[in-house]
Amino acid sequence: MNLLTPEAWKALLSRYSHIVLVANSEAVDFERLRSELPETALYVFFNNVYKVLDEPFAGHAVLVARSGVMGANIVHRREVGDVLHFFAGDDFLGVINIRVSPEENFSEESRFNGAKARHLDLTQMLGDLYPQGKIATSGFAMALWLADLQLPGKILLAGFSAKRSEKWKVFDVHDWTFEQIFLRLFARMGSISMLGGVDASPYSALGKRFPNVPPIEIAMTAAEVLSERLHNANGQIDRLMSVTKSIRAIENFFRRFKPKTRKERYLEKTKK
């Protein structure tokens, strides 16, 4: 495994004026990014970059390949070639194969079709931080790690909305609420910047309108309102679950006949 020390990582990344983490989201505005940022910016892409790229990327770039139990996801899904064709030349820094939980395994450098591959183990950093029973997203893990490196360049997060779109979904294995709270606090502390309108708090105007009200009172009132709205939403969700009970029963019946995935077969084999 090609594991680097924190000092080596810092030396590698300190040459860039900006480190831009690009989420696989429709919220990414590439035209704005490329027009506002200098050529010395490094763009960090994640896994299936075809979600945000339509053509080969011209500029400094690095690809973060997330690991699963069978190794890097793009490796065991045979997507390495499909992903790497978006990058070429000396401006491509290569692949960073990361793992964020003990169940995830690295892939060997030779599995990335000749691209320079480095490995980054973030399990210890996230072990006592992330909520139990959930797994951190690659973007969150990389943002936290980069902030801890204390690089001279600015760290920018593009498209980190945690919102489901008509085209791409968000996965329930991640704690999106925790990540958004953490990242926005990070942004307001100045450790990172978030592009896409999430830097400004929609409740900041309340503090200006009620200057004599302590911030904790404003926060508690907002939490009270949100709690009531969540309670009402849960009631509607319960009703929806009841209405769709028969549909889910039919779906579960036919799901039993669905062929097992390569991952499921691999896990069964490892348990024997």
Residue ranges of predicted features:
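Metal-ion/cofactor- or nucleotide/acyl-coenzyme-handling active-site neighborhoods
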Residues: M1-K272
